[in-house]
């Protein structure tokens, strides 16, 4: 039977099974504990209880084991029955233990999002030239050079936007099937948009949408553009052609696209290469998220749980990057 003490003796296995190191687990437990206790107090104090607080069977799994159970589920994405076999409990117990923890991890993930208040001040030194009206000079889709300086202190100079898709089980309802079918992936998917800075730290996550929705349509309806600091450079792939029209006063860096009879010239190819060298950080961030099988395998659960799962893992990935950046800053 799997237990925290047993796994702790094998740090390599611990990280392989949970997706995080023992130190990361302890830091996460310290954040989960006060929120879990507050949620339990609220639950026990609710009106209409049929049993007095403290009554009923006592669980043999403390909060540490419940968090471990949840992390195993997120990392390996086993069925509740399989997780129950690992921990020696029934699948209903797994569901009952992991549900509240997942909601707390989701809330912790949300807490890591957002742009820092000082982002605009940090970007001010690299503002594009202003026009006579005092605003930033409007940019064409590809007329601006991508930022070439990536600051080691994690300053937000660039907002890199991309969407990730995950396969879901096909619905029995035809209308739902049609909405979820992604022509790009040739499968039924759920799509989520991510926005990261040049360090790969996730600053914004959209609500998930059916896979048939185009990336640029998701961007326009997500509210992401309204939440961006006003002077930050927006960077995306060629699928987002047209966003420069949505924000004419912003600096926008998009790659050139070749067309029939109009191949890219060397300068355009170099421009695209420069953008790709910066955009790779969002691909690495998405890969870090998909290290957890719950975001890589066919998602078996309801859409509401999908949003909880991705936000929970976003928080884990962001905290790991924050820790790495802090080490680099201290070196």
Describe each PLM feature range.
Residues 50-65, 147-155:
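Glycine-rich, flexible loop segments associated with nucleotide phosphate handling
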Residues 1-61, 132, 325-329:
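Charged, often Cys/His-bearing segments associated with DNA-binding zinc-finger transcription factors
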Residues 82-106, 110-331:
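Short, well-ordered secondary-structure "scaffold" segments embedded in the functional core
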Residues 62-77:
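Short, amphipathic alpha-helical "recognition" segments used to contact nucleic acids or chromatin
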Residues 30, 34-38, 75-79, 100-103, ...:
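Short helix-loop boundary/capping segments at the starts of domains
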Residues 16, 57, 71, 207, ...:
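Conserved short-loop catalytic and cofactor-binding motifs
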């Amino acid at each position: 039977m799997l237990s925290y003490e047993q796994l702790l003796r094998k740090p390599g296995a611990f990280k392989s099974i949970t997706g995080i190191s023992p130190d990361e687990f302890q830091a996460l437990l310290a954040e989960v504990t006060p929120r879990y206790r507050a949620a339990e107090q609220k639950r026990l104090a609710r009106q209409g209880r049929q049993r007095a607080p403290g009554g009923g069977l006592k669980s043999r799994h403390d909060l540490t084991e419940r968090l471990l159970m949840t992390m195993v589920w997120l990392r390996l994405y086993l069925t509740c029955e399989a997780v129950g076999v690992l921990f020696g409990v029934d699948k209903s117990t797994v569901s009952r233990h992991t549900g509240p923890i997942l909601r707390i991890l989701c809330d912790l993930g949300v807490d890591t999002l957002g742009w820092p208040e000082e982002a605009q001040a940090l970007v001010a030194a690299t503002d594009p030239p202003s026009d006579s009206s005092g605003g930033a000079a409007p940019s064409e889709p590809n007329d601006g050079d991508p930022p070439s300086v990536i600051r080691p202190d994690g300053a937000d100079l660039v907002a890199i936007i991309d969407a990730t898709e995950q396969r879901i089980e096909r619905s029995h309802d035809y209308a739902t099937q049609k909405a979820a079918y992604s022509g790009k992936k040739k499968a039924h998917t759920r799509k989520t948009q991510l926005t990261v800075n040049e360090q790969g730290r996730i600053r914004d996550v959209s609500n998930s949408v059916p896979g048939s929705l185009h990336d640029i349509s998701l961007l326009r309806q997500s509210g992401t553009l309204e939440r961006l600091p006003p002077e930050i450079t927006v960077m995306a792939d060629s699928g987002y052609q047209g966003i420069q029209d949505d924000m004419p006063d912003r600096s926008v860096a998009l790659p050139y696209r070749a067309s029939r009879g109009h191949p890219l010239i060397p300068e355009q190819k170099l421009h695209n290469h420069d953008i790709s060298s910066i955009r790779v950080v969002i691909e690495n961030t998405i890969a870090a998220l998909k290290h957890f099988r719950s975001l890589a395998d066919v998602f078996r659960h309801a859409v509401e749980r999908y949003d909880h799962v991705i936000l929970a893992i976003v928080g884990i990935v962001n905290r790991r990057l924050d820790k790495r950046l802090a080490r680099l800053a201290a070196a």
